[in-house]
Amino acid sequence: MEQINSNKKHSNRRKYFSLLAVVLFIAFSGAYAYWSMELEDMISTDDAYVTGNADPISAQVSGSVTVVNHKDTNYVRQGDILVSLDKTDATIALNKAKNNLANIVRQTNKLYLQDKQYSAEVASARIQYQQSLEDYNRRVPLAKQGVISKETLEHTKDTLISSKAALNAAIQAYKANKALVMNTPLNRQPQVVEAADATKEAWLALKRTDIKSPVTGYIAQRSVQVGETVSPGQSLMAVVPARQMWVNANFKETQLTDVRIGQSVNIISDLYGENVVFHGRVTGINMGTGNAFSLLPAQNATGNWIKIVQRVPVEVSLDPKELMEHPLRIGLSMTATIDTKNEDIAEMPELASTVTSMPAYTSKALVIDTSPIEKEISNIISHNGQL
């Protein structure tokens, strides 16, 4: 009886292990099939970081800082005034430039008035010469007849020569003044144009005492302080556009065989965890490894060289809508997974092959409309250049 029970136990145990083996086989087979169909073409790296533009804010003119409107982490819009400089010196310089323009216009305007004056003098000298010539021609036969003395004729001849010289002098003076004017309008005279440009430059210098944000974003790296004297080109702070961000994923060179531009990428951040998945696209593959572009690149010609698998940065775009819902910060750690399974991989470019016709980034906030000062310059010229 005990022998029968023992045999039953061994039989049940064999059935259990057989069933377990079948279950494990099915599980491993399913896992392998899933890996073969879905995960085999996935490459992943946790050596990935958020990258973005940190637009530097610098002064274009020198001056003392009177106002700092924002501090780090503040949100600003494109065109907002970030820093203001003292306007006293710039205002004085602009007023001087306007006064100088008015004086130059008045001085140049005299050339046009002198043109009329010289023209009248030429006409008068020509009349005098014509009268002297006629007088001399009348007296020549009279002198031959002895009606008048030779002395009187010589005096008439001297008058003719003198009037001829006066006419030539008047013509030369007229031509010299005409050469200065050269039939050019007053507002196009070189000295007037130069003074007008100086006025415009002074006006621009005054406008640039208000330093504006070129983009919409967040303040970072603020270093400027009220009372500080800044110079052109000095860095004051940076503005980070929240929507101009992407991921640089550093993949091993052995992983890049089937990576192509346009492939989909799933990205997980350490900030939000696995519950938030960002969806991106491969937009570019760097033309060198990170080590190749370092400040001190490796010298592999040395005798103690050790081969190390290199990593190549792959640029991955981010969905702007997802960025708005879950904002990221520059430098955050990410995990990027590229789906390299694509039947048209042969038609997908490994490197960019087209030239982009549109600029990558633009800002209208830094373009200053000069129409107000141009109108004012035109008024100064017209008011001081009345003929």
From Swiss-Prot:
<dbReference type="GO" id="GO:1990281">
    <property type="term" value="C:efflux pump complex"/>
</dbReference>
<feature type="topological domain" description="Cytoplasmic">
    <location>
        <begin position="1"/>
        <end position="16"/>
    </location>
</feature>
<dbReference type="InterPro" id="IPR050739">
    <property type="entry name" value="MFP"/>
</dbReference>
<dbReference type="GO" id="GO:0098567">
    <property type="term" value="C:periplasmic side of plasma membrane"/>
</dbReference>
<dbReference type="Pfam" id="PF16576">
    <property type="entry name" value="HlyD_D23"/>
</dbReference>
<dbReference type="GO" id="GO:0046677">
    <property type="term" value="P:response to antibiotic"/>
</dbReference>
<keyword id="KW-0997">Cell inner membrane</keyword>
<dbReference type="InterPro" id="IPR032317">
    <property type="entry name" value="CusB_D23"/>
</dbReference>
<keyword id="KW-0812">Transmembrane</keyword>
<keyword id="KW-0813">Transport</keyword>
<protein>
    <recommendedName>
        <fullName>Probable multidrug resistance protein EmrK</fullName>
    </recommendedName>
</protein>
<feature type="topological domain" description="Periplasmic">
    <location>
        <begin position="38"/>
        <end position="387"/>
    </location>
</feature>
<comment type="similarity">
    <text>Belongs to the membrane fusion protein (MFP) (TC 8.A.1) family.</text>
</comment>
<dbReference type="Pfam" id="PF00529">
    <property type="entry name" value="CusB_dom_1"/>
</dbReference>
<dbReference type="GO" id="GO:0005886">
    <property type="term" value="C:plasma membrane"/>
</dbReference>
<dbReference type="InterPro" id="IPR005694">
    <property type="entry name" value="MFP_proteobact"/>
</dbReference>
<keyword id="KW-0472">Membrane</keyword>
<dbReference type="GO" id="GO:0140330">
    <property type="term" value="P:xenobiotic detoxification by transmembrane export across the cell outer membrane"/>
</dbReference>
<keyword id="KW-1003">Cell membrane</keyword>
<dbReference type="GO" id="GO:0015125">
    <property type="term" value="F:bile acid transmembrane transporter activity"/>
</dbReference>
<comment type="subunit">
    <text>Part of the tripartite efflux system EmrYK-TolC, which is composed of an inner membrane transporter, EmrY, a membrane fusion protein, EmrK, and an outer membrane component, TolC. The complex forms a large protein conduit and can translocate molecules across both the inner and outer membranes.</text>
</comment>
<dbReference type="GO" id="GO:0006974">
    <property type="term" value="P:DNA damage response"/>
</dbReference>
<comment type="function">
    <text>Part of the tripartite efflux system EmrYK-TolC, which confers resistance to various drugs.</text>
</comment>
<dbReference type="GO" id="GO:0015721">
    <property type="term" value="P:bile acid and bile salt transport"/>
</dbReference>
<keyword id="KW-1133">Transmembrane helix</keyword>
<feature type="transmembrane region" description="Helical">
    <location>
        <begin position="17"/>
        <end position="37"/>
    </location>
</feature>
<dbReference type="GO" id="GO:1990961">
    <property type="term" value="P:xenobiotic detoxification by transmembrane export across the plasma membrane"/>
</dbReference>
<dbReference type="InterPro" id="IPR043602">
    <property type="entry name" value="CusB-like_dom_1"/>
</dbReference>
<dbReference type="GO" id="GO:0042910">
    <property type="term" value="F:xenobiotic transmembrane transporter activity"/>
</dbReference>
